[in-house]
Structure formats: C-alpha cells, structure tokens
C-alpha cells in the first residue's frame, strides 16, 4: 500500500470510491467534494492522506483532517480538530489501512496543538457524526479510543406532493421577508450579537461566495432584524449542508436551517413561525422535498410534519 499526500488530482477517483461505498445513502458529487475537502482553508494537508493500491494505482482509502486555520475575527473550535471523513474500500478493510490513515491524521492534529478530535462537525462538514446505522464503523472508532457523546443528531425530512402558492405568515408589528444584499452589514451585526460562532461564520462565507440574500428569511419587528431562517436550493451559491444528498431526490431538494431568534424575543412563537416562513418560500419555488439538518429537536419540527430521516452518533477523543 502506498500513502500519498492530499492532492485534488485524485478528486474524481475519491468521489468514485465514496459512491462505491456510500453512494446509496450519501451520494457524492465531485463539486461537493472539492468544495468541502479541497477548497476549505481548514484542511490540514499534513493530516490528510490517500491510500493507493500499489498494483492498480487506484485510491482505496482516504482521510481528511481539519483544524481552524482561517484568519477571521471569529474562531471555531479552539483546541479542537476534526476528522471530516475516513473511508476505506470494503475490499481493503482489515488490513490496517484505516488505522494507518487515522494515525497520520491524529499525529498531524497533535502537532497543530489540537487537544480533542471530533468525528465530523467540521467547517464544511459532511456529517455531524457517524451515521447511526453504521454499527461496525462506530465499533471500529471505539476501539481506536473514541467515545460516544450526547444525543443523536437528526436530519429531518418533510415532503409536499401537492404544489401550492402560499403567503408568508403574518407577525404583529413586523414582517417576514427575504434578505437582500444591502442587508449584509445589518444581518452580520445581528448574528455577531445574538449568534456568534458557526452561524456567523457561515454567513460571512455565504456573502464572500456571492450570496445575494435569497437564502435567508428574516423576521423584522419595528424595522429591526430579530430572527432568521436559512433556506437552500439548487440555485444557492454553494452546496449547503441540508441539500448535500439532493441526488437521492429525482424532483429536487430544498433545505431549511439553521434558524434563530434574538433571546429578547423568544417565547412568542417566532421560532416555529420563521421555520414556516422558510418552508413557504421554498415551496413557492416549486420544491417538494425539504430537509432540516443536524438537529435534536425532533418533536419541535414534528409539529410541522417533519420526521427523522437520517441519524448520527457524535464521537470524540481527547488526547492525553
């Protein structure tokens, strides 16, 4: 077995390997793999490797390690590293390939000062944990010193077989509306005040990638933004997490979330209402399948007809 440094010339072959192993559940697109695993500035090149069969010269496994490396005023995961993905072909398992890839990733993360490694949950992640049905994968990582953490995370699915033209909900003393490019500064100020961290980071990237605002429904009270809901579809400026697996749906996929309401205005039903507003906006674009990703609030969203579609077990490992 040969181990070669992370190199985007292998992107198509790695995408093919992924789909060979996971494509029925999590169909990969080369565009998505390049976006999340090659273009992300947080990829640790010294910890990301490709296992290549010495005879066929085809990739049979790979690992992607990340830690925070961006030069922004915010930081995600101080002291945290991530294994974005570790995949070995079924035919090459049980030969130590996975252990070698993981060791290389962990050693590089240690050298970056990482104190704890999480599986998934990285910037530009694929998964918030190990797909819960993958019992053998969970057992393998447990043997490597990883421990299950907290509750299962869920991707939820809502489906609307009948097309509809709907009106945005009404709110006393305010309104729901789509964001515009001119709202960028006010929206980022709101997020920095109310939701600093990952959601703020994702919106910074959204506008940097040419976002126009159409991916956000906001609620305004007395002219001030007090809540938001992100919505994604095939026309978004990059592939967002709740539409990663759109190829599973012949008639397309939309996504809702994240969402949040200023703490001062909670308890008024605005959270559920802004989700409804996001759903209305997507349905008016002709979208009949909608995913809400990475949540434990299954009962909350069940009120809108959403059910758990995929589940993920969160795992981490603290370096001693």
Model-derived features with residue positions:
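A short beta-loop-alpha structural element at the N-terminal edge
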Residues: 1-16, 175-187
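Conserved acetyl-CoA-binding loop-helix of GNAT-fold acetyltransferases
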Residues: 88, 94-111, 257-261, 267-280, ...
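Conserved hydrophobic beta-strand within the GNAT/NAT acetyltransferase core sheet
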Residues: 83, 117-120, 256, 290-293
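Acyl-donor-binding surface of acyltransferase catalytic domains
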Residues: 103-172, 315-317
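Short hairpin/turn module used for nucleic-acid contact or packing/dimerization
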Residues: 267, 273-320
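A structural microfeature
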Residues: 61, 150-152, 227, 310
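A conserved beta-strand-loop-helix scaffold within acyl/acetyltransferase catalytic domains
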Residues: 19, 23-48, 61-78, 195-260
């Amino acid at each position: 077995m040969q181990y070669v440094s992370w190199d985007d010339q292998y992107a198509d072959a790695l995408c093919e390997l992924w789909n060979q192993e996971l494509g029925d559940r999590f169909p990969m697109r080369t565009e998505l793999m390049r976006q999340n695993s090659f273009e992300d500035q947080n990829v640790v090149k010294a910890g990301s490797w490709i296992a290549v069969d010495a005879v066929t010269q085809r990739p049979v496994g790979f690992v992607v390690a990340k830690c925070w490396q961006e030069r922004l005023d915010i930081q995600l995961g101080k002291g945290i590293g991530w294994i974005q993905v570790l995949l070995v072909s079924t035919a090459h398992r049980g030969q130590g390939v996975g252990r070698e890839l993981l060791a290389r990733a962990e050693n590089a993360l240690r050298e970056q000062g990482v104190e704890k490694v999480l599986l998934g949950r990285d910037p530009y992640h694929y998964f918030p944990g190990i797909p819960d049905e993958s019992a053998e994968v969970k057992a393998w990582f447990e043997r490597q010193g990883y421990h299950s953490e907290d509750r299962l995370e869920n991707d939820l699915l809502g489906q609307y077989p009948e097309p509809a033209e709907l009106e945005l909900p009404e709110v006393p003393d305010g309104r729901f509306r789509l964001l515009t490019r001119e709202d960028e500064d006010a929206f980022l100020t709101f997020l920095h005040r109310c939701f600093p961290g990952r959601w703020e980071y994702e919106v910074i990237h959204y506008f940097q990638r040419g976002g126009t605002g159409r991916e956000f429904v906001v609620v305004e009270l007395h002219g001030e933004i007090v809540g938001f809901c992100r919505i994604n579809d095939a026309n978004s400026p990059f592939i967002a997490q709740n539409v990663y697996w759109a190829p599973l749906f012949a008639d397309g996929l939309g996504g809702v979330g994240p969402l949040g309401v200023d703490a001062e205005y909670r308890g008024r039903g605005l959270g559920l209402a802004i989700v409804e507003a996001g759903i209305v906006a997507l349905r008016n674009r002709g979208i009949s399948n909608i995913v809400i990703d990475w949540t434990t609030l299954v009962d909350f969203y069940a009120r809108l007809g959403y059910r758990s579609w995929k589940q993920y077990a969160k795992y981490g490992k603290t370096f001693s």
